[in-house]
Amino acid sequence: MKFNKVKLVIHACVLLFIIISIALIFHRLQTKTHSIDPIHKETKLSDNEKYLVDRNKEKVAPSKLKEVYNSKDPKYKKIDKYLQSSLFNGSVAIYENGKLKMSKGYGYQDFEKGIKNTPNTMFLIGSAQKFSTGLLLKQLEEEHKININDPVSKYLPWFKTSKPIPLKDLMLHQSGLYKYKSSKDYKNLDQAVKAIQKRGIDPKKYKKHMYNDGNYLVLAKVIEEVTGKSYAENYYTKIGDPLKLQHTAFYDEQPFKKYLAKGYAYNSTGLSFLRPNILDQYYGAGNLYMTPTDMGKLITQIQQYKLFSPKITNPLLHEFGTKKYPDEYRYGFYAKPTLNRLNGGFFGQVFTVYYNDKYVVVLALNVKGNNEVRIKHIYNDILKQNKPYNTKGVIVQ
């Protein structure tokens, strides 16, 4: 009997120990959950993702584009020969006087599967997407929904910083915000922008030019806040659909998956695939895929005043060194003395555009390399366009 009592006491103690242990573990888990920074919490589908899922429910893959190339035209024959001899791996599109004159693929879209680049291949345009963000920003200005000189805190009241940051400084990359550091922990644009606000301003860089993806991520969030719509919806309803850019898509749009180029880079063991694993946080600054022909189509339509009036378009495209456009860089692109330029490089893919009133040259590659050397040779040496185009300090009407 005595032995049974001892046994019962031991069992009771063990049971009590188990209950206390479970309670402590539960308490620690609860504390840990509540202490997680909201930036790092897993979220449901973002507004951008919801919009794209709904949009693509009934959408099918776009119609195939045909190769455009006239071997009888000496300059285009020379461009083709040059791209082949330089082992170019990508696609090219060239518009001359608003007409598509060349559209051709070289090398492979997917080396593992042996899928070749064609005019249908869509490339990750990286920072060239800032041009689209700049256009959306400009549209909101012209609609009097924003003032480019207002502080960002007027539109995002929670975006508090040690010094005021006008939207214009974000657009010109002179906000002073610390360089954006992407993280796999950030699952959407909101989390990325909260992280940017949390890091704040580098006093040494305030009001000084420093290229920073973070500036355009914040602008993308401002666009969302002002319109009450996701960045993706703004892009499609204000640019993509009106201008019929049917071979452009965000990184996660299923109907376009088979056309998306994979990016590569050479390392000590050979060619390596660079997986783009942070694009969910890059709305506004680097998660758009385009064919070179669609980018050329976008630019030619802007030149033809299909997005803005001549009064807005001409200064936007040509002025620099003036009060309104003090720098070569504005709204995601450069206006330089001999050309206008867009460029983006992300996860082994490089997307570069040179253009003037006669030619739009778009060169996209998906094996990391120097795209600038090739496009300069095509634009300056073959097409002979190294001549005055924009004049510093001249106000354009």
Swiss-Prot record:
EC code: 3.1.1.103
Secretion signal, residue range per the UniProt entry: 1-23
Uppermost EC category: hydrolase
Induction of the gene: Transcription is dose dependently increased by the addition of beta-lactam antibiotics, fosfomycin, and bacitracin.
Catalytic activity from the UniProt record: [(4-D-Ala)-(2-GlcNAc)-Rib-ol-P]n-[Gro-P]m-beta-D-ManNAc-(1->4)-alpha-D-GlcNAc-P-peptidoglycan + n H2O = [(2-GlcNAc)-Rib-ol-P]n-[Gro-P]m-beta-D-ManNAc-(1->4)-alpha-D-GlcNAc-P-peptidoglycan + n D-alanine
Molecular function, one GO term: hydrolase activity
Membrane topology per record: Peripheral membrane protein
Keyword set, alphabetical order: Antibiotic resistance, Cell membrane, Cell wall biogenesis/degradation, Hydrolase, Membrane, Signal
Subcellular location field: Cell membrane
Function noted in UniProt: Catalyzes the liberation of D-alanyl moieties present on wall teichoic acid (WTA) and lipoteichoic acid (LTA). Affects the methicillin resistance level and autolysis in the presence of Triton X-100 as well as the cell wall structure.
Other remarks in the entry: Inactivation of fmtA results in reduction of the methicillin resistance and in a modification of the cell wall structure.
Protein name: Teichoic acid D-alanine hydrolase
